[in-house]
Amino acid sequence: MREEAPSRAQRVIDNNDILFQCVRPYQKNNYIHRILNTSNQQWVASTGYAQIRTTELPNYIYHLLNTDEFNRKVMVRCTGSSYPAINSEDLATIHLYYTPDKKEQLKISRLLDLLDKRIATQNKIIEDLKKLKSAIIEKVFCPPNQKQPVCRIKGFEQPLTTYKMSAFCSRIATKNKDAKCSLVLTIAAQYGLVSQDSFFNKSVASENLTGYYLLHKGEFAYNRSYSAGYDWGTVKRLDNCDEGVLSTLYICFKINETIVDSDFLTYYFESTKWHKGLSDIADEGARNHGLLNVSITDYFNTKHRFPSMAEQKVIAKMLNAITEREKEAIVLGECYRKQKQFLLRQMFI
């Protein structure tokens, strides 16, 4: 609203005005305003957007502006490399090709509007599944100084057991002898162990990979780098490939599956409950160049508290079911987005 807007937002927008993103337009964060102004309330737009008011059907033009072909015409007129941008005057020189038939415009826009709503619904489903999984993870695991988690699985009442990390896992220090493996991995907090090339679009590893640790599918790695939301680093299991190599800055390990279930442990490390064990042995102030000052010995001396193997497997099965639903929802959401892009290519020139 106008009274709440910053000084750079000075232009009053009206119902059905289209706001086109002028900075980094390839992101397609465009918007069609659907709220009428009143005598007591006016809406304004940032100067980072071009304000478009059309005599054609607004929804139809909005979808046309989101096509890849229109975006290509915009990008060739942009200036700047890191933050490519187009001004309103240059944007106005782009020719639009569209059907003048208002009935056809209406049918096309209604179809694409319905698809947009379905995509938004699917995104909400995905987000809700992520929230559900995160909430369960925080309830069914507990830190080493807590007797039991907030929630126990029905039918399981036996006390949890506290273990040193060295009791249920062993360090991996196998080097990539003879450069057997060339796939360099990195830990991305949200995506797990992934190819460095695909994540950074380049390799930042040494040319000589013989000194790197060799990790196999199902084994774990701890990244001592901390970042916003990950104050104690991240632990991830290698799931997406058979093997890869990691910098010696990582602590790599495999688990004893007679004590801890692999899937259970994977979800445990998605929780915050293991942070307590690490904070008990780490020097809070010892953070060097973005790395926690945690020695290998200290790391394997951290304490963790787990239920019986039977309860672990039930917890893992429950969380795996939610994860599968989440994956299916993500795939379906991607199908809807691809369907929309296909329709945009077919319905607009």
Stretch-by-stretch model annotation:
Residues 152-177:
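Non-catalytic DNA-recognition/assembly elements of restriction-modification systems
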Residues 26, 41-48, 79-103, 243-249, ...:
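A short glycine-rich beta-alpha junction/loop motif
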Residues 1-6, 169, 173-206, 245:
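DNA target-recognition patches
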Residues 8-68, 211-274, 287, 295:
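A short beta-sheet element
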Residues 6-7, 80, 113, 203-209, ...:
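Short, solvent-exposed loop/turn positions at domain surfaces
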Residues 23, 65, 140, 168-172, ...:
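Hydrophobic aliphatic residues
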Residues 141, 173-178, 273-278:
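Proline-centered turn/helix-capping motifs that create local helix->coil transitions or kinks
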Residues 90-95, 99-161, 310-349:
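Amphipathic alpha-helical segments with low aromatic content
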